[in-house]
Amino acid sequence: MTFYNCRQFSVLASLGYLLMCGFALADTTAETETDGLLPLYLLEVPDSVDDILIADTSAATMHRFVRSDAGIMHEDQRYMSIGQAGAGKEKAWDRKTPLGVYFITESLDTSKLHDKYGAAAFPLDYPNAWDRFNKRTGYGIWLHGVDHNNPQRPPLDTDGCLSLPNEELLRLVDSLQPLVTPVIVARQLDWASPADLDALRLEFRVALDMWRQSLEQGDLVTYLSLYADDFIYRDMSRDDWSSYKLGVFEARQLAGVALDDVLLVADPEVKNLYLSRFTQVLMTDSGPVTTTKRLYWRRSDDRQWRIVSEDSG
């Protein structure tokens, strides 16, 4: 049996499947050279996030990256099954796995679930605000194990969930934090240089800080200028949002606004779409008001950043 170095990246889903089924394979190494590169999606990871999962659906591989004093490091990888119809979910029961940035919401008691979910199960927050913006439907997308009685699953085998071998998922259980651990689901794992990521991060930070300052200063004109014309918040259009925020700004004076635990990521599917997720602390006369927010940003070719959707949680 050949065991692969966890820092070599699988490019053939069939190899992962055969390994899981116990077949011996000849020595094989990936052609992709990633030395010195980082995942394209990870612009800024806060201290509160220790682990990031990135699912490479084209290679049937789940990668785990960890944050360390030395930066973002590739920790390990494992075989994964996705939806029977592949990736790119658009509607309920299309048996596709959604592409995007998601978060684990909770850990379920699998003793109360069907055997097909295996040793552990973690629901993801599909559909998120960006999915709703695009009118995607469906629900019940989980990261889970496999049936103990039928553990050998091909790469395309679920109803849309991400499925890992039980022993592999159990190795991750202690690392998966509800409402903290990001799960980035991509068609393929793309890379960028640290210098390119840092330049983009600084640009993103400028836009985010402009949003924070305008909120803190009660500058409604600047605040609304950061929202795209096609912005949607739940059932609100940009015009509805503007009217709503006018009332909010007039009614509330803030002594300060802090953004903590800032996570900045690039969407794996849509070019120039980015997510900022953070803990927002509003300093009010009656004390601090703390919420977790997500802003989905679109970056134009001339480097203008505009918010297209937002949500809490």
Predicted regions and their residues:
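Bacterial N-terminal signal peptides
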Residues: 10-22
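Boundary at the C-terminal end of the N-terminal hydrophobic targeting segment
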Residues: 24-26, 30
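Gly/Pro-biased beta-strand-loop elements
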Residues: 33-140, 151
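Exported/periplasmic cell-wall-interacting domains
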Residues: 94-99, 108-209
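Surface-exposed, charged secondary-structure patches
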Residues: 96, 246-294
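Hydrophobic pocket/interface hotspot
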Residues: 211, 223-224, 241, 297
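Short, well-ordered alpha-helical segments enriched in acidic and aromatic residues
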Residues: 217-230, 234
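Short beta-strand edge/turn micro-motifs at domain boundaries
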Residues: 288-313
